[in-house]
Swiss-Prot record:
GO terms for biological process: histidyl-tRNA aminoacylation; L-histidine biosynthetic process. This is ATP phosphoribosyltransferase regulatory subunit. InterPro entries: aa-tRNA-synth_II/BPL/LPL, HisRS-like_core, HisRS/HisZ, HisZ. Heteromultimer composed of HisG and HisZ subunits. It holds the Pfam family tRNA-synt_His. One of its GO terms (molecular function) is histidine-tRNA ligase activity. Its main location: cytoplasm. It is found in: Cytoplasm. The keyword Plastid does not apply. It comes from the Bacteria. The keyword Amino-acid biosynthesis applies. GO terms for cellular component: cytoplasm. Required for the first step of histidine biosynthesis. May allow the feedback regulation of ATP phosphoribosyltransferase activity by histidine.
Amino acid sequence: MQTWQLPEHIADVLPTNARQLESAREQLLALFRVHGYELVQPPLMEYAHSLLTHIDAGLSLKTILVTDRLSGRQLGIRADITPQVARIDAHLLSANQGINRLCYAGPVLHAQPDGLLNMREPLQAGAEMYGFADIRGDIELIDLMLKSMKIADMGKVLLSLGHIGIFRALSDAAHLDAGQSATLLALMQDKDTGAVEAQVKAWKLDGMWAKAFSLLPRLYGGREVLSDARGRLPDLSAVGGALGELQAVCDAFPDCEIHIDLSELRVDNYHTGLLYAAYAADFHDAVARGGRYDGLGGYFGRARPATGFSFDLRSFIGRLPAIERQPAVLVDAEDAEAAREAVEALREQGQCVVIDYGIGHNVSEELAGRLKKTDGVWQVVKR
């Protein structure tokens, strides 16, 4: 193996893209800030039992574990920042009984990629709201998610909606146990209608519930899906409430193209209600995903309503505007000491000044000039 090789699905970010990413990160955090979201920076690594909540068993497959040489305890390198933010809200910010609006932008590390085209070191950015159960909170986060997409040239963005509350209401009414629910969840995630029908038949479910479960994978499309679902799904209060929340989101974004999929349920995840995602042309998967995950903080001692979204900012590379490098001022190496005061004055003004050692450099081809002493004064002389 060559010493310069990197692990699979791991890559360097070189200067041109690094400038784009840092600029996008700054714009994103500024956007979050003006909407009231405070920046938090959880550690990259912490005790594994804090990262691997019982709510999301699938997270353990993504988390890289190591032994702490100081304590001998097992540490985990974070694969998702949301559980860390839930811990912060539940423990470190517990004095606030009202709403906590929090945001972040930092690297995570995956033991295995989410897909063949995914990286194992995403730059996860997101915003989360804790302490507000109303659908208006979800609408606020969806609005912020869609605004976040505008920092890159995404073109037309499709908003995809789902609601795991419908499936759970049907599961409870049909008296499915945890194993049966997990089996149906997996089948629905695969959109395997035939397998769903065969499974509920094998369980000999009551006809009404068997029909409802078989119907869910077929309930997808535009806004009209909601009226179709109201007329065909069992009349349960929880189902009606979930459909009402989906309708409220549709009404809040009248000009947005919306796709609804009532079998989009996200297996092995911590979401509990409304699910939302943003899709853009030429992306093989959702650009951003979010949803409601009430109770996640209960693992850390304070269960609260919560909703939020996140995405991999590195996936935006190729859609971000070019960030030109500032033209540099050169100063000859032999003049550097004598011109130190002038050089530092220029740098304090934000001007890039590079010492020219006469062997080439990686600064911009377009130079702002060269620092020369003219009539006893150091001045930038244009070429």
